[in-house]
């Protein structure tokens, strides 16, 4: 992917993970609500009010990306997987491009992504 495409896909994943985080909370009932509701949940609150840390890592294939996604789902870690429609890259083929985990504590995320290299 081109650098701009990588940035866009990472932005989609990051925002999607935040929106998913609130979506899975019992009191929100599947709707995207204001961040104020979600701030009652410790990992998200600490992340939003702290350093807002994000790390970009590299995988070698769509399958490796899907494996990370499945591992996150298995461990009940908030995750958002992005599939690009393929309109500007990938020759019109919908392609898995990116995912975001969390926000959560390093001890939750690192066992899933600790083996990956920085982008």
Each language-model region and where it sits:
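Positively charged, small/polar-rich N-terminal and surface patches that mediate targeting and assembly
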Residues: 1-119
